[in-house]
Amino acid sequence: MLHPDGSSRPPTREQAQAILEQLAGPQATLRDDQWTAIEALVVHRRRALVVQRTGWGKSAVYFIAAKLLRAEGHGPTVIVSPLLALMRNQVAAAERAGVHAATINSSNVTDWADIHDRVRNGDLDVLLVSPERLNNPDFRDQVLPSLAHDAGLVVVDEAHCVSDWGHDFRPDYRRIRTLIGELGANVPVLATTATANDRVVDDVATQLGVGGGETLVLRGGLDRESLRLSVVRAGNPAQRAAWLAAHIDSLPGSGIVYTLTVAQAHDVAALLRERGHPVAAYTGSTETAEREQLEADLLANRVKALIATSALGMGFDKPDLGFVVHLGAPSSPIAYYQQVGRAGRSTASAEVVLLPGNEDQDVWRYFSSVAFPSELMVRNVIHALELDRPQSTPALEPLVDLGRTRLEMVLKVLDVDGAVRRVKGGWIGTGEPWEYDEARYRKLDEARKREQQAMLDYQDTDGCRMAFLRSQLDDPDLLDGERCGRCDNCTGSRYDGVVDAAAAEDTRARLMRPGVEITPRKQWPSGLAKLGVNLSGRIGDGPSPGRVIGRVTDLGWGARLRRVLEEPDGEVSDDVVQAAVKVLASWDWTTRPTAVLALDSDKHPKLIGSLARELARLGKLTDLGTLQYAPERRPVAAANSAYRVAALHGSWLPPDPAVIGSAGGPVLLVDDVTDTGWTLTMAARVVRAAGAPDVLPFALAATS
């Protein structure tokens, strides 16, 4: 930093303190451990990994370092940040310190060109980018080289995402290693996280040191002195939801209620609103503008709680958040520590309550089932790519049997490994050799199972709950036998898990209210011609909107429907028939069905057939029997839409037009479970081709 006498002197702690006061107010005081990190970056130009508890002030460290480096004439700071909520909070924090900051992410596409110009012109002090942007062809080729050359500091926020040993690994984060390797050895790099055990710390530190010196690791204690941890065994889903409805008003301030699935978030939010509680659902499917409004509502205490999935997590900063409740346990105690860390940052006390359920492990198993694919599937992706002709992800789907999400994950991993490359227009192969690290993936799977068992152990422990979580994170400051003195096990003060019987029954009735609309498919997947199916464009002969009793992930009907689908095939039970009748009675169809047709099934022919017969009898509808499979049909194990449609094409014997015509109106088409919607779509085409004027699909359950 230049002084009046023309000399250049290293920045001082006093200068750092002044910037901190701009960030956090005149009452803020820079701590020794924060200055150690800042000094390592600004004075010694080190690469550092800071592992500190939520609320320690990691963002203050990199904003202070960014401003000090900028004052010395260095280039802008590049912050890689994973979530939009995190970016919004960080831009606001930078502005408070007089730092010119901008962000490039999926929600501000129209601003990208202007921001690129500001980067090239040197008008920005800080640029926040999502990890996905690092391999966007335009950004990678036009903006990233100058950033790598001119950057004064590179920051990797939520750095545990870099490591596939971490609880929230993101393939895009692996590109950061490439970015760091292209930096000059004297460009400081800072990685920050609150959730990294020894294995993750070692992995991240190694990746951080690529092309530079040894990584300085600064780890602090992870105790959260304000949090009072509790576990409440309240029973089944309805009883747990009733417990929440009865206790939410007594919880301090405003907070977050986490659920494991999107369906649960919406169910619980609707239930609580009906009980008069000001809450709203917040999930990964919530539109960006609505997310921002919901975050603002919570920050301003206009809502008692957001009922959220993990989409509301890293980076959301409300210092006075009074409580975090989990309606269902996450699969990792490390992920749990991170989510509960949202609470009590600036308050003397905050309540953290876990309401675990027996069905939690079903959700864990589902998410485990969509992990990294087999070697054969990955090699199919490599072989499908050409060296000189880019192919988009939708164009690749008909060539490989992977769903969109898993295909994108595979492409990102292969890109980092050098086997494929993203270019304008899609993806190309590189011809470089690639090895499938089966041993590593097996070890990762084993590590995930250990985390799941640890989460079960957390629920059952009679020891200190905070000490348990800190031990999972290998907290260097945790002493043998240390107790927090605040949790339910340390104090003996526990919430009563007993729920008023009438309230529980009322909640059960609300959650068990059957009926969920299923939207028909409107567009054929691209590339079907490559699979020998001559279908494209809009679907003109599919079904109308349909209904299911519920989703298998619902808090209400979910558990019952899972049991029905898992049990040996047999006649439909009375409670399921009654639920189906309620759904049909509340269905606001334009034209009532006049007939019922069951879909053939390998798993549940008796279940579906008996349900269709009962609906025909009770509704006085014509029973058309079963739409039979064709003998030559192909098995439908496909993961993506194109393969699934191709497999379903020609799967049923065409019904007799005279039989279909005898119905004299729309046909109710009955199935057991709908996942992608393609089975009902393809079957409806067959029925309509035989003369049905309309097809109304009905299934017991939807998977999502």
Indicate residue ranges for each PLM-predicted region.
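PRPP-dependent phosphoribosyltransferase catalytic core
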Residues: 491, 507-514, 681-704
